[in-house]
Protein backbone atom coordinates (compact mmCIF):
# COMPACT_ATOMS: atom_id res chain seq x y z
CA UNK A 1 0.00 0.00 0.00
CA UNK A 2 1.34 3.44 -0.90
CA UNK A 3 2.39 5.57 2.03
CA UNK A 4 0.60 8.92 2.16
CA UNK A 5 3.29 10.83 4.00
CA UNK A 6 5.19 14.03 3.46
CA UNK A 7 8.09 15.84 5.05
CA UNK A 8 7.63 19.55 4.35
CA UNK A 9 9.68 22.67 5.04
CA UNK A 10 7.40 25.71 4.93
CA UNK A 11 8.81 28.87 3.40
CA UNK A 12 9.40 31.44 6.11
CA UNK A 13 6.71 34.07 6.47
CA UNK A 14 6.22 37.43 8.24
CA UNK A 15 -17.87 10.33 27.86
CA UNK A 16 -20.04 12.92 26.40
CA UNK A 17 -23.58 11.93 27.17
CA UNK A 18 -26.76 13.96 26.85
CA UNK A 19 -26.38 17.00 29.03
CA UNK A 20 -27.94 20.39 29.59
CA UNK A 21 -26.99 23.07 27.05
CA UNK A 22 -23.72 24.69 28.09
CA UNK A 23 -23.57 28.15 29.50
CA UNK A 24 -22.48 30.62 26.88
CA UNK A 25 -21.36 34.21 26.85
CA UNK A 26 -21.86 36.05 23.54
CA UNK A 27 -19.00 37.90 21.90
CA UNK A 28 -17.99 41.04 23.77
CA UNK A 29 -18.90 44.42 22.23
CA UNK A 30 -15.18 45.04 21.59
CA UNK A 31 -14.92 41.94 19.45
CA UNK A 32 -13.86 39.45 22.12
CA UNK A 33 -14.42 35.72 21.72
CA UNK A 34 -17.47 33.71 22.67
CA UNK A 35 -17.15 31.81 25.93
CA UNK A 36 -18.80 28.47 26.60
CA UNK A 37 -18.86 26.30 29.71
CA UNK A 38 -18.86 22.59 28.88
CA UNK A 39 -19.50 20.00 31.57
CA UNK A 40 -16.85 17.29 31.54
CA UNK A 41 -17.73 14.47 33.91
CA UNK A 42 -19.47 17.01 36.12
CA UNK A 43 -16.70 19.61 36.05
CA UNK A 44 -17.08 22.98 34.26
CA UNK A 45 -14.53 23.50 31.50
CA UNK A 46 -14.15 26.91 29.85
CA UNK A 47 -14.04 27.05 26.08
CA UNK A 48 -13.30 30.14 23.97
CA UNK A 49 -14.40 30.46 20.36
CA UNK A 50 -14.41 32.61 17.28
CA UNK A 51 -16.79 31.25 14.65
CA UNK A 52 -17.92 32.44 11.23
CA UNK A 53 -21.63 32.33 10.48
CA UNK A 54 -21.32 29.28 8.20
CA UNK A 55 -18.15 27.37 9.11
CA UNK A 56 -16.70 24.75 6.81
CA UNK A 57 -14.84 22.95 9.59
CA UNK A 58 -14.01 23.03 13.29
CA UNK A 59 -10.68 23.10 15.10
CA UNK A 60 -9.88 22.71 18.81
CA UNK A 61 -6.61 24.12 20.20
CA UNK A 62 -5.03 22.78 23.40
CA UNK A 63 -2.52 24.87 25.35
CA UNK A 64 0.74 23.78 26.93
CA UNK A 65 2.26 23.58 30.41
CA UNK A 66 2.01 27.10 31.77
CA UNK A 67 -0.56 29.28 30.05
CA UNK A 68 -4.24 28.85 29.17
CA UNK A 69 -6.19 28.95 25.93
CA UNK A 70 -6.90 32.62 25.52
CA UNK A 71 -3.39 34.13 25.73
CA UNK A 72 -2.00 31.21 23.74
CA UNK A 73 -4.56 31.24 20.94
CA UNK A 74 -6.41 34.57 21.06
CA UNK A 75 -3.59 37.02 21.73
CA UNK A 76 -4.54 40.63 21.06
CA UNK A 77 -1.73 42.92 19.91
CA UNK A 78 -2.53 46.35 18.42
CA UNK A 79 -1.14 46.50 14.90
CA UNK A 80 -0.40 42.78 14.70
CA UNK A 81 -2.44 39.76 13.65
CA UNK A 82 -1.64 37.14 16.28
CA UNK A 83 -4.98 35.59 17.28
CA UNK A 84 -5.05 31.99 16.08
CA UNK A 85 -8.80 31.84 16.67
CA UNK A 86 -9.38 34.95 14.55
CA UNK A 87 -7.12 33.73 11.75
CA UNK A 88 -8.91 30.39 11.50
CA UNK A 89 -12.35 32.01 11.73
CA UNK A 90 -11.37 34.38 8.91
CA UNK A 91 -10.67 31.35 6.74
CA UNK A 92 -14.02 29.76 7.51
CA UNK A 93 -13.31 27.56 10.51
CA UNK A 94 -15.08 27.45 13.87
CA UNK A 95 -12.04 27.83 16.10
CA UNK A 96 -12.07 26.82 19.77
CA UNK A 97 -9.49 27.01 22.57
CA UNK A 98 -9.93 25.10 25.82
CA UNK A 99 -8.79 26.01 29.33
CA UNK A 100 -7.84 22.77 31.07
CA UNK A 101 -8.49 22.31 34.81
CA UNK A 102 -6.63 24.91 36.84
CA UNK A 103 -5.96 27.13 33.84
CA UNK A 104 -7.61 30.39 32.82
CA UNK A 105 -11.35 30.37 33.46
CA UNK A 106 -11.57 26.67 34.36
CA UNK A 107 -11.35 25.98 38.11
CA UNK A 108 -9.30 23.21 39.64
CA UNK A 109 -11.18 20.14 40.78
CA UNK A 110 -11.24 19.04 44.42
CA UNK A 111 -7.86 17.33 44.12
CA UNK A 112 -6.10 20.53 43.11
CA UNK A 113 -4.02 18.56 40.61
CA UNK A 114 -4.20 17.89 36.88
CA UNK A 115 -2.98 14.62 35.40
CA UNK A 116 -2.48 13.77 31.71
CA UNK A 117 -5.32 11.23 31.69
CA UNK A 118 -7.72 13.68 33.32
CA UNK A 119 -6.78 16.36 30.81
CA UNK A 120 -7.13 13.95 27.89
CA UNK A 121 -10.59 12.92 29.08
CA UNK A 122 -11.65 16.56 29.28
CA UNK A 123 -10.30 17.25 25.79
CA UNK A 124 -12.21 14.24 24.45
CA UNK A 125 -15.42 15.46 26.08
CA UNK A 126 -14.95 18.94 24.62
CA UNK A 127 -14.41 17.45 21.16
CA UNK A 128 -17.67 15.57 21.57
CA UNK A 129 -19.47 18.77 22.51
CA UNK A 130 -18.01 20.67 19.54
CA UNK A 131 -19.27 17.92 17.22
CA UNK A 132 -22.80 18.48 18.52
CA UNK A 133 -22.53 22.15 17.59
CA UNK A 134 -21.62 21.31 13.99
CA UNK A 135 -23.42 18.04 13.16
CA UNK A 136 -23.13 18.56 9.40
CA UNK A 137 -19.36 19.04 9.50
CA UNK A 138 -16.53 16.52 9.78
CA UNK A 139 -15.33 15.82 13.29
CA UNK A 140 -12.97 18.54 14.56
CA UNK A 141 -9.26 18.77 13.92
CA UNK A 142 -7.35 18.69 17.21
CA UNK A 143 -4.24 20.86 17.62
CA UNK A 144 -2.03 20.53 20.70
CA UNK A 145 0.94 22.74 21.57
CA UNK A 146 3.92 21.47 23.56
CA UNK A 147 2.58 19.49 26.54
CA UNK A 148 -0.83 19.85 24.93
CA UNK A 149 0.48 17.99 21.90
CA UNK A 150 1.16 14.87 23.95
CA UNK A 151 -2.36 15.00 25.38
CA UNK A 152 -3.78 15.52 21.89
CA UNK A 153 -1.92 12.41 20.80
CA UNK A 154 -3.35 10.48 23.74
CA UNK A 155 -6.87 11.53 22.74
CA UNK A 156 -6.30 10.58 19.11
CA UNK A 157 -5.23 7.09 20.19
CA UNK A 158 -7.94 6.54 22.81
CA UNK A 159 -10.86 8.18 20.95
CA UNK A 160 -10.08 8.38 17.22
CA UNK A 161 -13.79 8.62 16.42
CA UNK A 162 -13.89 12.08 18.05
CA UNK A 163 -11.58 13.80 15.54
CA UNK A 164 -10.63 13.96 11.89
CA UNK A 165 -6.99 15.05 12.17
CA UNK A 166 -4.47 15.68 14.92
CA UNK A 167 -1.68 18.27 14.87
CA UNK A 168 1.25 17.83 17.26
CA UNK A 169 3.00 21.20 17.49
CA UNK A 170 6.15 22.07 19.42
CA UNK A 171 6.77 18.58 20.76
CA UNK A 172 8.80 15.54 19.75
CA UNK A 173 10.39 12.68 21.65
CA UNK A 174 12.25 9.44 21.08
CA UNK A 175 9.51 6.77 21.16
CA UNK A 176 11.99 4.27 22.59
CA UNK A 177 12.18 6.31 25.80
CA UNK A 178 9.55 6.49 28.55
CA UNK A 179 8.07 9.30 30.59
CA UNK A 180 8.61 9.20 34.34
CA UNK A 181 6.73 10.61 37.30
CA UNK A 182 8.38 13.61 38.90
CA UNK A 183 8.29 14.01 42.67
CA UNK A 184 5.46 16.24 43.82
CA UNK A 185 4.60 17.68 47.23
CA UNK A 186 1.73 16.25 49.31
CA UNK A 187 -0.41 19.25 48.41
CA UNK A 188 -0.45 21.53 45.35
CA UNK A 189 2.06 24.37 45.62
CA UNK A 190 -0.19 27.04 44.04
CA UNK A 191 2.91 29.03 43.07
CA UNK A 192 2.62 32.43 41.45
CA UNK A 193 3.44 32.70 37.79
CA UNK A 194 6.09 35.17 36.64
CA UNK A 195 6.60 37.64 33.82
CA UNK A 196 9.92 35.95 33.08
CA UNK A 197 8.13 32.66 32.51
CA UNK A 198 5.63 34.39 30.23
CA UNK A 199 8.42 35.76 28.03
CA UNK A 200 10.55 32.62 28.04
CA UNK A 201 9.05 30.94 24.95
CA UNK A 202 9.99 33.88 22.73
CA UNK A 203 13.59 33.16 21.84
CA UNK A 204 14.42 34.91 18.59
CA UNK A 205 13.93 38.70 18.31
CA UNK A 206 14.12 38.30 14.52
CA UNK A 207 10.62 36.83 14.47
CA UNK A 208 9.22 38.27 17.70
CA UNK A 209 8.40 41.99 17.89
CA UNK A 210 8.73 43.39 21.40
CA UNK A 211 5.09 44.51 21.27
CA UNK A 212 4.00 40.88 20.87
CA UNK A 213 6.08 39.75 23.84
CA UNK A 214 4.76 42.59 26.01
CA UNK A 215 1.15 41.82 25.08
CA UNK A 216 1.60 38.12 25.78
CA UNK A 217 3.21 38.77 29.17
CA UNK A 218 0.34 41.04 30.22
CA UNK A 219 -2.48 38.83 28.95
CA UNK A 220 -0.89 35.59 30.18
CA UNK A 221 -0.34 36.96 33.68
CA UNK A 222 -3.93 38.24 33.80
CA UNK A 223 -5.32 34.88 32.70
CA UNK A 224 -3.01 32.64 34.75
CA UNK A 225 -1.59 34.41 37.82
CA UNK A 226 -1.12 31.05 39.57
CA UNK A 227 0.77 28.11 38.10
CA UNK A 228 -1.31 24.97 37.60
CA UNK A 229 -0.13 21.96 39.62
CA UNK A 230 0.55 18.87 37.54
CA UNK A 231 1.42 15.30 38.38
CA UNK A 232 1.35 11.80 36.94
CA UNK A 233 3.58 12.41 33.92
CA UNK A 234 4.09 8.66 33.69
CA UNK A 235 0.58 8.61 32.22
CA UNK A 236 2.06 10.15 29.07
CA UNK A 237 3.32 6.67 28.24
CA UNK A 238 -0.20 6.08 26.89
CA UNK A 239 0.96 8.14 23.90
CA UNK A 240 2.51 5.55 21.64
CA UNK A 241 3.05 6.80 18.08
CA UNK A 242 2.91 3.21 16.82
CA UNK A 243 -0.76 3.16 17.88
CA UNK A 244 -1.65 6.50 16.27
CA UNK A 245 -3.89 5.81 13.26
CA UNK A 246 -5.46 9.27 12.92
CA UNK A 247 -4.05 11.48 10.15
CA UNK A 248 -1.31 13.50 11.83
CA UNK A 249 0.74 16.63 11.23
CA UNK A 250 3.90 17.00 13.32
CA UNK A 251 5.13 20.59 13.27
CA UNK A 252 7.82 22.62 15.02
CA UNK A 253 10.05 25.65 14.57
CA UNK A 254 13.59 25.17 13.32
CA UNK A 255 14.88 27.17 16.31
CA UNK A 256 12.77 25.48 18.99
CA UNK A 257 15.32 24.37 21.62
CA UNK A 258 12.86 21.84 23.04
CA UNK A 259 12.61 19.80 19.84
CA UNK A 260 15.47 17.69 18.52
CA UNK A 261 15.22 17.00 14.79
CA UNK A 262 16.43 13.43 15.36
CA UNK A 263 13.65 12.81 17.87
CA UNK A 264 11.07 14.33 15.53
CA UNK A 265 12.23 12.00 12.78
CA UNK A 266 11.99 8.96 15.04
CA UNK A 267 8.52 9.95 16.24
CA UNK A 268 7.35 10.61 12.68
CA UNK A 269 8.66 7.25 11.48
CA UNK A 270 6.98 5.45 14.38
CA UNK A 271 3.50 6.88 13.67
CA UNK A 272 1.27 4.07 12.42
CA UNK A 273 -0.90 6.25 10.20
CA UNK A 274 0.19 6.36 6.56
CA UNK A 275 -1.47 9.77 6.29
CA UNK A 276 1.14 11.91 8.01
CA UNK A 277 3.21 15.02 7.43
CA UNK A 278 6.19 16.65 9.13
CA UNK A 279 6.53 20.43 8.82
CA UNK A 280 9.48 22.55 9.93
CA UNK A 281 8.94 26.33 10.16
CA UNK A 282 12.22 28.10 9.30
CA UNK A 283 13.33 30.69 11.84
CA UNK A 284 10.49 29.92 14.24
CA UNK A 285 10.94 28.85 17.83
CA UNK A 286 8.58 27.37 20.43
CA UNK A 287 5.88 30.03 20.02
CA UNK A 288 5.73 29.95 16.21
CA UNK A 289 2.00 30.68 16.12
CA UNK A 290 2.48 33.99 17.95
CA UNK A 291 5.58 35.19 16.13
CA UNK A 292 6.07 36.59 12.64
CA UNK A 293 5.74 32.99 11.47
CA UNK A 294 2.03 33.11 12.44
CA UNK A 295 0.76 33.09 8.85
CA UNK A 296 3.01 30.18 7.85
CA UNK A 297 1.90 28.25 10.94
CA UNK A 298 -1.79 28.81 10.14
CA UNK A 299 -1.27 27.93 6.49
CA UNK A 300 0.50 24.68 7.34
CA UNK A 301 -2.46 23.48 9.39
CA UNK A 302 -5.12 24.62 6.94
CA UNK A 303 -3.21 23.04 4.05
CA UNK A 304 -3.11 19.79 6.01
CA UNK A 305 -6.83 19.92 6.73
CA UNK A 306 -7.55 20.60 3.04
CA UNK A 307 -5.05 18.14 1.56
CA UNK A 308 -6.43 16.22 -1.42
CA UNK A 309 -6.87 12.47 -1.10
CA UNK A 310 -3.99 10.32 -2.32
CA UNK A 311 -6.36 8.36 -4.53
CA UNK A 312 -9.30 9.56 -6.62
Model-inferred region functions:
Residues 257-263:
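Conserved alpha/beta-hydrolase "acid-adjacent" motif
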Residues 54, 59-93:
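Short, surface-exposed "cap/lid" segments of acyl-processing enzymes
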Residues 120-138:
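Conserved acidic catalytic loop of the alpha/beta-hydrolase fold
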Residues 284-294:
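Catalytic histidine-centered segment of alpha/beta-hydrolase-like enzymes
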Residues 244, 250-252:
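Short beta-strand/loop motif that positions the catalytic acidic residue
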Amino acid sequence: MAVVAAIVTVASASALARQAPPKTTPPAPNGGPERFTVQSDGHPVALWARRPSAPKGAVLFVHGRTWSGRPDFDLQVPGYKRSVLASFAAQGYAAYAVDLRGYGATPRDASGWLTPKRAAADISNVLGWIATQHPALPKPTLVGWSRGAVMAGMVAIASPQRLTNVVLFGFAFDPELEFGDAEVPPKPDMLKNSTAAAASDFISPKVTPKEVVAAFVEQAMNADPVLADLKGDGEFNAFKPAQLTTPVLIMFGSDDPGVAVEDAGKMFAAVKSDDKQLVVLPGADHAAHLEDTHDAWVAAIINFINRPPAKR
